[in-house]
Structures are given as C-alpha cells and as structure tokens.
Amino acid sequence: MQRSPLEKASVVSKLFFSWTRPILKKGYRQRLELSDIYQIPSADSADNLSEILEREWDRELASKKNPKLINALRRCFFWRFMFYGILLYLGEVTKAVQPLLLGRIIASYDPDNKVERSIAIYLGIGLCLLFILRTLLLHPAIFGLHHIGMQMRIAMFSLIYKKTLKLSSRVLDKISIGQLVSLLSNNLNKFDEGLALAHFVWIAPLQVTLLMGLLWELLQASAFYGLAALIVVALLQAFLGRMMMKYRDQRAGKINERLVITSEIIENIQSVKAYCWEEAMEQMIENLRKTELKLTQKAAYVRYVNSSGFFASGFFVVLFSVLPYLLNEGIILRKIFTTISFCIVLRMAVTRQFPWAVQTWYDSIGAINKIQDFLQKQEFKTLEYNLTTTEVVMENVTAFWDEGFGELFENAKQNSKNRNISNSDNSLFFSNFSLLGTPVLRDINFQIERGQLLAIAGSTGAGKTSLLMMLLGELEPSEGKIKHSGRISFCSQFSWIMPGTIKENIIFGVCYDEYRYRSVIKACQLEEDISKFAEKDNVVLGEGGLTLSGGQRARICLARAVYKDADLYLLDSPFGHLDVLTEKQIFESCVCKLMANKTRILVTSKMEHLKKADKILILHEGSSYFYGTFSELQNLRPDFHSKLMGYDSFDQFSAERRNSILTETLRRFSLEGDAAIPWNETKKQSFKQTGEFGEKRKNSILNPINSAKKFSVVQKTPLQMNGIEEDSEEPSERRLSLVPDSEQGEAILPRSNVINTGPTFQKRRRQSVLNLMTHSSVNQCQIIHQKTAPSTRKMSLAPQGDLAEMDIYSRRLSQGSGLEISEEINEEDLKECFFDDMESIPTVTTWNTYLRYVTAHKSLSFVLIWCLVLFLAEVAAFLVLLWHFKEKPPQDRGNSTGSTNSSNAFIVTNTSHFYLFYIYVGVADSLFALGFIRGLPLVHSLITVSKILHHKMLHSVLHAPMSTLNMLKAGEILNRFSKDTAILDDLLPLTIFDFIQLALIVIGAIAVVSVLQPYIFLATVPVITAFITLRAYFLPTSQQLKQLESEGRSPIFTHLVTSLRGLWTLRAFGRQPYFEALFHKALNLHTANWFLYLSTLRWFQMRIEMIFVIFFIAVTFISILTTGEGEGRVGIILTLAMNIMSTLQWAMNSSIDVDSLMRSVSRVFKFIDMPTEESKSTKLIKPSKDDKLTKVMIIENQHVKKDDLWPLGGQMTIKNLIAKYTDNGNAILENISFSISPGQRVGLLGRTGSGKSTLLSALLRLLNTEGEIQIDGVSWDSVTLQQWRKAFGVIPQKVFIFSGTFRKNLDPYEQWNDEEIWKVADEVGLRSVIEQFPGKLDFVLLDGGFVLSHGHKQLLCLARSVLSKAKILLLDEPSAHLDPITYQIIRRTLKQAFADCTVILSEHRIEAMLECQQFLVIEENKVRQYDSLQKLLSEKILFQQAMSPLDRLKLLPHRNSSRHKSQSKISALKEETEEEVQETRL
C-alpha cells in the first residue's frame, strides 16, 4: 500500500478533499489494484481503536454493577460527534434562511416597491454565499460523522472478536455462527450508515420550529394546515410501509424455500445430472418463483405508490398552506414562492429526516445493547495444571455441558416427583429434563504415567471428545479432580486448516526445527503429497484447504499436533479420513515410534490400536464401562465389542458433508413447505412410534436408544430478534455431547427441532458455534448464514451501504426500498462476506448490458417510450400553469379588495385568484395521475424482466457442463440466485423508476427556466456537460473502490469463521494473540478501502454542489439583471433553480446507483452465457414406467435398431479413457481400459485420492473425457446425455435428499403411482420408515432429511435406482458411515433387486467387496491391475498389504469361487436381516 497523501495535505486540501485526486486519476485511467490503496492513518488502525474502547469498557466493568457499553462509547467519541453535529445543524439552518432572501428578491420586483430594486443584486450575492456556506459546512460534517461511525464499528469489531476467542464452550453451544456474523455485520453497519442521520433527532424539531415561525409570519395560522398535511403524508407513508412489509414477510417463506432448494441443487449438481433431474428441479424452483413474484409485485406496487406520494406531496402541501390564506387575502406571489421553498425544506425534515433519525437511534441502541450483552458472556477458563507431575489423573470426575445443571436437575427432578408431572407436550420441559440433566461424563477415573498410550473407545455420544475437552479446559468438571503437567497438544477429529501454507499450518507459530519438521512430515505420510505440489510445502491453502483431500487435511492436522513439543498429546479420532494402509502406517510410525516417549491419549475403536495401548478406557453413555489393559478387557468384559459396534460407522466423517453450512443456513424448519408461517407461532406435529416397533428395534445398532418414544417435530417461529438472545424455550433441547450425530448428520439421533425424549440418552444437533467447530466440511468457508431455530431476525438483500449512495438522504431512501427477505440474519452481509470474488466485469456497466436488459422483454421498450410521452404531457400541463402566473391579468383597481400596500400587493383581482386556484389544483391532480400511470407499467415490466433473466440463468446453470461449474464456488452461484436476483426484483426496478422520475423533473425544471429566460439556457449547457464529465470521471474509481471494499470485507468474516472452527486448537496452542493480529490486519485492509471510498465520495459530492453553486450564481444574476417588471418570472426561476440543486444531486446519485446495480445484471448475463452440455436431443424424454427406455430415445441413435431396447444386458467396454476436470486441466485418469460382462460385479480398489470416484463420474459423462466407452455395443458419443445417464443407477457418496416430500424425492417427474412406489419401498426396507411419518409419502423432508438416519438416506437413493430400472449400477462407497444392519439390508437389496444388473462398486471396506467377481486396482490415476480376487490375493500389491490376517480369513471362501456366493452365507444373511428389513428405526 502507498503512503496516504492525507498525511501531508493542507487544510484547504482536506476541506475540499483534493488529496484524493491521484487515486481518482489512476482509477479513471486504469484498473486499481490493492497496492494502489493508501495506508490508513494511525488513528484509524484497529489496534489503536480497540485499545481505546477496550480500556474504557474495562473501566466500565470495574466501576459499575450494570456496565453500559454506550457509556464507554460516549467517553471515546462524544465530543467529536457533537462537534460535527453542530456543523450539520448550521448547514441545515442555511437551508431555512435561503427562502427569506428569495422572498426579498421577489419583493424587490414589485412594481409598487421600486425602492428595494437596487438591493436585489446584494440579496442575490447573499443567497449565493449561503449556498457556498452550506456546502462548506455540510460535507465536512457528514464525512466526519461517517468517519466516527467507521471508527466505532472498527473498535467494536475488534472487541467482539477478542471476546469470541474467550467465550466458554457452553456459551458457544448457544450461539449460532449466523448470530455472530450478524452481530458483526448487520448491527455494526448501522454505525457506518446511520450516524450522519442520528443528529436529526434534535436538528429536525429545531428546523421545524424555525420554519413554522417563518411560515407563521408569512401565512399566519394557514401555515399549520400545511404542517398537518405533511404529518398526514408521513403517517400514510408509515401505513404503506407496514403494508409493504406485510407482503415482504409473506414472501420471505417462498424466497427461503427457493434458496433452500437452489442451494441443495448447487451443492449436489453432480447428483442432479447423474439422475437426469435437471428439468424436474427447474420446474420445482420455477413454481416457487411464480408465487414469490406475485408477492414481489404487490410489495413493489405499494413501494411505488409510497415513492410517488412523496414526489407529489409537494403540490398538496403548498396547496393546504396557501389555500386558507388565499381565500382570505388573495394571491401574493412573493409569499407563494417563499412558501414553496419553505415547504420543500419542511417536507424533508418531517417525512424523511426525523423518522430516519428516530429509526437510527432505535436500531443503534438495540445493536449496542446486543453487543453489550455479548461482551458480558461467560469466558473460557484455562484448566489449572501442576508442572511437577508427570502423570495424567482424573478422580471421580462428573461434568455437565450446561453450567450448574447438576444441582438444578436434582431439584427439578424432586419437584417433578412431588407434583407427579405427566410426560406430555404440555410439560415438555420436565419430560425432557432427563435429557438436560444427564451428565456428559459421570464418575470417570483413570491414571496414566508419562510415556503411556491411553486408548479411549466407545459408541457415538459416549463422551470421548468431552473427556478431551475437560483436559483442555473447555469443559469444567462439576465434581472431581483433574491433574496434568500443563503442556498440551491437540488434534481434533474435525480437520481444521487455517489460511496459509502447509508449513505454516504444521509449525503453527512454534519455533522451526528442520529435523523435527522433516521427521513429522515423514511419520504422517505427507512426503508424497507435498512432492506433488510445485511449491512443495509452501503451497498456499485457501478456504479450509479446499484443494486438499479429506485424508490430506487430517494428516496435516495430526502433523501440527505432533510437531509441537508437549507433555500430553490428545488425538481425537485422527484417522477418520484415511484408507486402511495409510492409517496403519501412520499409527505405527507416528503414534507408536515417533511419539513413543510421550504421554498420548488416542480416541479410537480399531482393535489393532487397542491391542497396542498401555491402558484402555471404554465409555458408555458417559460412564466408564471399562478401564485397564487389553488382556484384562478380554477377560473381564467379553461383551466389550458390542459397545464399539457402529463406532466406525458414525464417528468418522467424510470429507464432504451433506449437511454443509451452505445448505443448513437457509433451512426453514416447517412441516409445510408451501406456506409462509407467521413468525410468532409455534407449529407442532407429533407422532408416536408403536410399541411393537420399539421392541423390534430395541437392540438394533441403528437405534442404540430405547425406541418407544414420542417425537415432536417443532416449528419454532418466534418474534424478531436482532442479535444474540437467551432463548427461554431452549432448555427443552440441549446438547449433551460434543460429538455430532453422524457424518450426514442424523444417523442415530434426531437433529435441530426434532425433540427425542428417551430415558437414558438423548441430544439434538445444535446449529451453534460449537456445532460449527464439530462439523468438518470441505466447503467450510462457503457459509451464507447458519439458521437458528429459536431466533430469527430481519435481513435485507439490499447491499448495506453498497449502492454508492451520494448523500445521506437518498442513501437512506435506497435502503428503505431494500428487500426484506427473511426473519433471520442479514443474508446480504453474509453473502458478501464470503462470496465476493474478483470479477471479470468492467469497472463501469457497458452499454451492451443496458441494451440486453432493455430488450429482454419486448414490452419494456414500449413502456420507456410511453414514459417519455407522458413526461412531455406533464411539461405541457406545467407550462399552462406557468403562463397564468407569468402573464399578469388585467386588474380592476376599483374592485380590488386587497390593500395596495407595497408589502402586500395583489397580482390578480378577487375574481381571478379563484380561477388560478382551480388551475393549480387541476394541474396538480393531472401531474399526479400522469405520474402514477407512467411509473406503474415501468415497475411491472422491470419485474417481468427479472423473472425472465432468473429463468434463463437457472436453465443455464442446470445444463452447464461440470467442467464449467467446477470453476465456480457454490457460494458464487448461489449469490446470483439470492443477492443479484433480489437486486433485480426489488432495488433495480424502483431505483430505475426513481432515476427516471428525478431526471425528468430536472430536465423539466431546466426546460421551464430556459423558456422563462432564454439566456439561462446558455449557462445550462456547460453545467450539464460538466455534470456528465464529472460523473464519467468519478464512476470508474467509485465502482472499483466498492469492489475492493467488498473483497476486503471477505477476509474479515472468513477469518472469524476460520477462528471459530479451530477455536479449540487455537486455545490448546495459545495462538489467540496471533489470530487477533491477523484479524486487525484484515480490518485495516478493509478500512483502507472504505475510508478512501468515503473520501472520494465526498470529493464527488462537493464538486456537484460547487458546479451547481456556479450555475445558481449565473441563474441568479441573469434573472436579476435581465428581468424587467414582474416578480412572477423571477420567483419561478429562482425557486426552480433552488429546487434543482437537491433534485439534481439525487438524480446523479440514482444514476450511479443504477450503474452499480446493473453490475448484478452483468453477472447474471455472465451465467446466462455459460456453455451447455453437448446434447443432440433438445427435448427432454422423461423416464418410462416399464423396464425399458422409450422408443423415442433410441430412434436418435443410428447404431440401434428401432425395435431394440437399450441397454439390454449392461455389457461395458472402456478403451483408453482419459478424464479431466477442466478443458485445459491435467488428466485425472489416464489410459483406463477394461471390460465388464453383463451382470458382472466389479470392485474398484485404491487408496484415498487414487481416482475411484472420478472414474464413476467419467462413466456418467460428468467430466471432460476422451477415449471410448460402449454399453451393449453402443458408443457414448452416439446417444444424448439424457439417454446415456438413464442407463445408470447411481448411489453417490454424497447422499442427495432435497427439501420435498418422500414422493418427490423418489419420483420427481411423477411417473409412478403409489402402488409402484410402495412396492419399491418394501424391497429396500423403507416402508416401515415412511409409515412412521404423518402424511407418509407426502411428508415433507427438510434440512437434507434430518429426521432420517444416514442409512435410510442411502436406502432412499437405492430406491431411486430400483425405480429407474437401470441395467448398470454405480455405487460410490455406499457403506460409508452405515451401521451393520443397514449395510446388510443394502447388500440384500443389491443381490435381489439388481441380480441381473452390472454393478461397479467403489469401497474401502474389505467385507463390502465379497460379492464382486472382478477387481480394478487404480494407482496414480492409472489401472494397476484388473483381475479376479484369487490373483489379487496371490500377488504383493497394496491391496494385500492393507489387509490384516482377519480380513484375509474373511475372503478365503471367495478364493475358490468368486462368482458364486456361498448359499449358506446367503441363508445366514437372510435370517440375520429379515426382521430388521421389515421394521427399521425412524
């Protein structure tokens, strides 16, 4: 960054913002880079501001029982705030004085008062000086207030972040990431945007008082009629605003539903294409969009009437002010024109400034109170340790995740017994109190000496991670003692990668030791991975390590923990993402050898690990099931294996979570997805499992919880909240374990708003910061907002301060028209936080974009022409009125009822002034009617254009090739459908309307002034030229600075989320100061862009006013010097000239707003222009109902006869297959060749990242591929994509359950009747599951099907494949995270329903390969071997090395006959699973 010219700028340069000229010049000539931005002043640095506020806040905490954050802010910023407030008031006073001088100038032209004619020139000079003074006062004041608001935001940003790093885990469990981001963005933005308006809460009343005093002198009591009219207008606007909000609130549900479906589709676009569901998904979204747009139009119409009413109110305010006076006294032009000027200022004060100021204070005080509450939350306390000890000891330790719940639970339980409270929904708190009061750990005892290895095992939710958290100090024990030596290193089971290089992630601030570093890299099997990067270990890892596989991230996290020299190493399931061979090597070389002399606590369930551990601790439901050695375990606890069954299924998380933050944040927790539910309701729907069901599932691994329970699906829809609130209803749903339910969320336990009441162990997944920390996701930074079930808040898709608002009035109006989309957090802020990226879009919107936008709908061009015609009609009507005022009618002095006093001279007779009054009312009504007719079709047409563009963009995205979509982030795509679509729906139509309205007013006013005084036209031409030139000069720099500011905002929130994800690791390593410094650096970067934008913005505003002042000086002296007799003409000219100033500024602001908003249109067009997948068929052929493809599909294939049915057998031939993710990318698979016989089952083998899943994608033509693939002799390039993909049934690794009914998820095209669907549900064992839900097939699944276990989701995918009648089945690790029972069900279904199908199976589990006849071994992106099981076992390859002797014994029956499964085994399998298939757990 460059040094700021502000440091050496003179006072004059600072006053006129001339020091910004270098950056403006550079931005106009070339694209700005980050290096071009100026450094911030030291007074604005985050370190300085946070230190000042933190000192005052600490002082407040120390001195008072009830500390107030506003007092700390007052001591920091009050005097500067008041100084700029006084400047602002003085600037506003000049606006009230100007009409007085105008009245004196008009009076000097009274033919009966020629004495004052000589002073008109001096009055004109005074009027011009007032404009100059106003400019010099207002702009520094507004800039200073914006600057103070920025400083307040920075200081509180830092304070909140520091507090976040100190919060206890108990508090983090109650706060969602959405609330935190909202606290930082939505609440704190109020200071940036609203502080300049805050002073009007006292300025506006003083202004109104002054103006009413001046109007009283002119009109006497008649002035109050005008004030009453303004108050009525303000109340009417408030009423229309409430009506508009009602429509937007109704629309919020539809928008959320659409965004949920859209986000699910974007995240699972590969599955959508594999299932050929593009058209079904498109139709589903369009149906939601249709209803949404109806409500959008209603809200837009009300908003339009509101805006039109403001523009038209000026006529009627003057009318009500002048009419009573006119009836009594007659028309006096001097008073009329003076009154008009006063009313314009009065209108702004009453209808804009004061209401906005009150709202600003209300919002700001609310935001400060929320931040104040947050800053007083409980903090994390480091566990005390003993440096003299060498052992780790726990004695009688009991712990609750909720502080003080032990005592509270005992008291409540005793009260419950005494009162005999029933277990019903009406007493939900007490019926679930066993859930709340159950300790996460109970009476834990163990002791390990230095250098020993303790293995902790147990089923999901047993308390393994909680035990490690106790050692870290994250969980405080309620009872017992903990002792350790103090130096701890920690490896979380949820891989956390901070932004930086691989080396920085491993060293993590510890002193660099080359030998130790290399040893750790080698022991963690990272040498080969690092060697593949061109930059080796200096390669930069962005956004949570998106470029790494899950296994690579896990190994880097393990290396980080091992590299630190500590006394105690806590390793929480570090091998979850690793293949069998890599896991075996790391355990031996790293855990057993490199760390042999260190004390280690390892969470694991592998039998091999337990055998080598010095001590074993098995936890069950929070209690110690066993503690001792492995030999003691075998002797004393022979049934221990039952406590571990299913552990692998649920404790290891895949790299890509189905329920990623991106999808979870947009969830609506309702049962009815098609209705917008009032926010103050709580909707419940309960259903009870039968006793028979519970008995059958009682001992199932799928359901370790006793199953005879009552479930209550709760839709919480409380009132609006704007921050972090304590939920009074929340105790009914508490989390008891840090361990999430399952990989796909929900394998065992209900989640979110599903309350599971059981006698022994219950919990729910909280969407909290704690949950964020325990959720591993590749897309960890692709967060829009985390939905909070019990709390909701307002959010706007209108960019907050993003529309290049050029003054505080028009800026507030633009925000007032923003889209209120949901009652949660500010979605727009979140989206901009995480998804704004460098765009290949011009700095200024091109004319081609405007042309494409205008021609997108044929009626829009005609509407624009219609607007122009009506404008000409309005100008003509206005000229009629002016003609009557301009020409003085004949006067009958004898019949005149008025006085001939010079100060009250009448221009017309008593008869004619009523005639003029009728003309005035008629013209005003006509202008209002014409304006209404003009604007309404325009707004309607623009919304229709938005509908068309959204449809085209959705179609383009769904049909774009994966090579194109792989280049885009999911958040970037979703931004187009959320932020940009909202701009097209709401802001752009009304901003265009405002701009057209204002531009026409300015043009009309200039035309009228030029008609009245042609000489003024000569001054108008250069002024308009100067305005256009100035705008063209400023706009490129403005847009680029806004883009840089937006990009600078992203690291702030990305760093926040990154810190929260790794908070346990940060604390364990003591890296909080380092991350605070990084956060301040990100804040300073954003501040540099924002401060420069504010400065250039004020430079532009001052130049606009300076140009206008020159224009007004010219108009004033031309009219004074050239106008003869007739005060009417001078009054009209000067009044219109004064009004042109504010209107022209507003019009210029709107023009820049339009250009800024049109960038969203450019982004939408960029997506519309994406290439589409190759397809010879333009018409979608839906799946047929029988066991074949329709004849229409095969006619297009020249290689298939019309009477043939393809595919028949499922024979596949692959020759020289090469696959790439992008057109110009490196080959992911090279020269893959093999063949599969009809009905054969092929297993894909290879270590993590070898290309197994890539091969399955290539077979579906989801990647850029070269080579040849044939199915039954038909080549893949001779059929359409739809034909080809329908030949496959798919069970993807990433399970796709979209928000919709069971029926929609199974049959989105509605091709099958209920009988056929139930038949398939029976085959896969889903009938009993579906029947447990109200509505059965019509039950709406939300949140990725959170009420289903991961196993049931797999069965749902299996049912889709059965319905598709596919001849080839592709399975990508279908057994991952499955319990044994569900896995056996899937195996049975595959054997029965797909007995004659070709199956290609990718698996890590050895036992999952028992049914395969051939195996394809992939190494280094190539085929290593393609052979039968016998040959694979007889040769020394990785497959054999990865197997334990036990695995080999399992495969012995298959060495002699790999084609046929032993009938005895089949019979045993049937007997084992028959009962489980019939009844499966809900």
From Swiss-Prot:
Tell me which residues bear Phosphoserine: 549, 660, 670, 686, 700, 712, 737, 768, 791, 796, 814, 1458
Major localization listed first in the record, in broad terms = membrane
GO molecular function annotations of the record: ABC-type transporter activity; ATP binding; ATP hydrolysis activity; bicarbonate transmembrane transporter activity; chloride channel activity; chloride channel inhibitor activity; chloride transmembrane transporter activity; intracellularly ATP-gated chloride channel activity
Q: Where is the ABC transporter domain?
A: 423-646, 1212-1445
Residue positions of covalent lipid attachment, annotated as S-palmitoyl cysteine:
524, 1397
Identify the residue span(s) of motif PDZ-binding: 1480-1482
Topological domain (Cytoplasmic) residues are 1-77, 147-195, 244-298, 359-859, 941-991, 1036-1096, 1153-1482
Q: Which InterPro entries is this protein grouped with? A: AAA+_ATPase (IPR003593), ABC1_TM_dom (IPR011527), ABC1_TM_sf (IPR036640), ABC_transporter-like_ATP-bd (IPR003439), ABC_transporter-like_CS (IPR017871), ABC_transporter_C-like (IPR050173), CFTR/ABCC7 (IPR009147), CFTR1_ATP-bd_dom1 (IPR047082)
The written remark on domains in the entry is: Binds and hydrolyzes ATP via the two cytoplasmic ABC transporter nucleotide-binding domains. The two ATP-binding domains interact with each other, forming a head-to-tail dimer. Normal ATPase activity requires interaction between the two domains. The first ABC transporter nucleotide-binding domain has no ATPase activity by itself. The PDZ-binding motif mediates interactions with GOPC and with the SLC4A7, NHERF1/EBP50 complex.
Describe the protein's quaternary organization and the partners it interacts with. Answer: Monomer; does not require oligomerization for channel activity. May form oligomers in the membrane. Interacts with SLC26A3, SLC26A6 and NHERF1. Interacts with SHANK2. Interacts with MYO6. Interacts (via C-terminus) with GOPC (via PDZ domain); this promotes CFTR internalization and thereby decreases channel activity. Interacts with SLC4A7 through NHERF1. Found in a complex with MYO5B and RAB11A. Interacts with ANO1. Interacts with SLC26A8. Interacts with AHCYL1; the interaction increases CFTR activity. Interacts with CSE1L.
Q: This chain belongs to which protein, by name? A: Cystic fibrosis transmembrane conductance regulator
The protein's organism comes out as Carollia perspicillata (Seba's short-tailed bat)
